[in-house]
């Protein structure tokens, strides 16, 4: 019985992480949870991001992002900055779902 409760508690703790990484791009920097800069090359990125067409495609904090229409639907609000030095997170948009991943795990907490 104790085992059942333990598993239930663990499942509840990790449940939010299993949902889609729903992202909304805000208009102003002060509205954002994370400031993002898009780099030109994979090797410069902290995170390789794949833009998922459907929220069911995106999972957890693995770089599979689904951009939502409304701010209230988002897990994270991001702002695209003009300069690399202003960013909390450097991303590269990859055309391949299989390539989506963290290159700098130290910044992974930004998207939880």
Show which residues each predicted segment covers:
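Repetitive, compositionally biased segments used for assembly/scaffolding
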Residues: 19-112
